[in-house]
């Protein structure tokens, strides 16, 4: 078999560059608790307008909160809270985000609307070459000034958080598929500095729309597209030796997962699970999922169990996925016909699908989502209207587990004393706050 035949067996050519940030581009475009405490917080969406970072001490008149109820899912909507001339991150799609206890970090993105994307002030239009953080305790958006070289592949890259470091791999610039990346860029969020990770071995192809995870000290990258060719390749980067290896599973080609992009992955330490994804012309089912066994170096096909009354989740791509222990949550996405607004949970021990009672306030795809260590998921941005090619800058949060007593008390404290972050560390210690909580204020 020739090298070209081997390439074609694992990849398929499309008719045009795959979209990296939504419609209008390319052919396709914890701690949980027990008992009843805090159950009112569970599976309820809250929309967060967020305050921009404002220098100085200007007083701001806050508008009252309005409550709306959609079916059985109450949603708190907070109206525009901004001074004229200030705003949070513009609407975008194709970006990525991660979260720790203190901040949501949002990187990159795409918006072809000239005015929405910043107009003449955005040198990288229609992309966003910027890093934002949303501070949970104060509700403040802040665009981070960083040193070093920030990557220019700003749509459909992969992003993970490793300690204080953001690891970015792949992605595409404009036009989609014409300026892809295959480097690993690292940003230390404490020191606000970017660096290029020097690696050995054969790197993956220049791709975007791949999925990535860190497992046992190694970075695993699966799938993706060049814009025209879709991949089933699986690569591993040892973060200690910084050496890339392309894994060659012990499977026949017919037993490999279908080539895809804009899928998501989950893992349990032994297997990597591939969830959804597709190509410009299809979206893959979630009835059966492929799993790569790290111990046997082989792909396995796993039949999942449907919801008793509803069945399986719809096939989708461009969705989001977060994981809490052995529970995986997917939300939103696009099935080739409609934008989805549902949320599903898959248990990696039973492989049972459960549909959550909450519905996303805005069905969306090409959005990003991240979950905090305490189990609160944040969803930002994405495409909300295919025909109008419309994006959103909305930020929502939803508790996926019952919040701990500490988290409930913390949220009550922040609501009662919104200026708590303005106090000195000494004052906060005198009030009885722990060092851990004080760090979450800074």
UniProtKB/Swiss-Prot annotation:
Residues with PTM Omega-N-methylarginine: 13
Spans annotated as Disordered: 1-57
Pfam families: Kelch_4 (PF13418), Kelch_KLHDC2_KLHL20_DRC7 (PF24681)
Top-level taxonomic group: Eukaryota
Kelch repeats: 87-154, 155-198, 199-260, 261-319, 320-364, 365-403
Localization annotation: Nucleus; Cytoplasm
UniProt keywords, alphabetically: Cytoplasm, Kelch repeat, Methylation, Nucleus, Repeat, Ubl conjugation pathway
Assembly information from the UniProt record: Component of a CRL2 E3 ubiquitin-protein ligase complex, also named ECS (Elongin BC-CUL2/5-SOCS-box protein) complex, composed of CUL2, Elongin BC (ELOB and ELOC), RBX1 and substrate-specific adapter KLHDC10. Interacts (via the 6 Kelch repeats) with PPP5C.
Entry protein name: Kelch domain-containing protein 10
Species of origin: Homo sapiens (Human)
Gene: KLHDC10
